[in-house]
Regions:
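Generic structural signal for beta-strand residues in well-ordered domains
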Residues: 9, 28, 63-65, 169
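Outer-membrane beta-barrel biogenesis signature
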Residues: 12-38, 48-50, 134
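Outer-membrane beta-barrel transmembrane domain signature
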Residues: 26-28, 34-38, 43, 108-209
Length: 209
């Protein structure tokens, strides 16, 4: 419990975005909804401070199918919000491909390690997925993002990161999905969200309404 509390406390203090995906290249059906929740644990490496810290995140998510190849999503996570989309660009006999754009906003609180600040992030990813039998799907993807940091004390920071992820989606009964995922990213320019990188593993439970 102490480890989990410390991890959640770190996420609350820092302005890290949610980099999880928890979905394949196939959007949900037009006119339908999907809700779910997820939890993850991982680590952040801060090269400037030469430190490594544990982290964790809890998420709630909602998706709506707009048209055959597009759905829109809303994600609430500690301590921010994200809007995203799944746009399928190819549907093959085995593999499907989709683009994954997102915008997120995070508010970090003042503490001994951080200041009161607003963080904004934009990301574009891609995922390729395919079925494995009747109940399993697997997916692999990459993404890149840009972040801005506005502290209350003045000034501005920014950063560019690249990352990758792998996931498996298991259909429980007719409407339920269990989705484990492994993801990682590296900041290649600037210092937002951290001068370094992070890795996390998590699991999501989603239901089609």
């Amino acid at each position: 419990m102490r480890i989990l509390a410390s991890a959640l406390g770190l996420v609350l203090m820092t302005g890290c975005p949610s980099t999880s995906v928890y979905r394949t290249a196939d959007p949900i059906e037009p006119g339908s909804y999907q809700v779910g929740g997820a939890t993850s644990i991982g680590g952040i490496s801060d090269e400037a401070q030469e430190t490594r810290s544990a982290t964790g995140q809890t998420e709630l998510m909602l998706r709506y199918g707009v048209i055959e190849n597009l759905d829109l999503g809303l994600k609430l996570f500690v301590p921010g919000v994200e809007v995203n989309a799944t746009y399928r660009v190819h549907r093959g006999n085995l593999w499907s491909w989709a683009l994954l754009p997102s915008l997120s906003w995070v508010r970090s609180k003042e503490s001994s390690a951080t200041v009161d600040a607003i963080n904004a992030f934009a990301s574009l990813g891609g995922v390729a997925s395919r079925p494995l039998g009747d109940k399993w799907h697997i997916g692999f993807g990459v993404y890149s993002g840009y972040g801005l940091y506005w502290p209350e004390t003045g000034g501005r920071g920014h950063g560019v990161w690249v990352g990758s992820f792998a996931l498996a989606d298991y259909q429980l009964r007719d409407r339920w999905h269990l989705t484990p995922e492994l993801s990682m990213y590296k900041v290649v320019s600037g210092q937002v969200p951290v001068t370094g990188g992070a890795m996390q593993t998590g699991i999501a439970l989603r239901v089609d309404l």
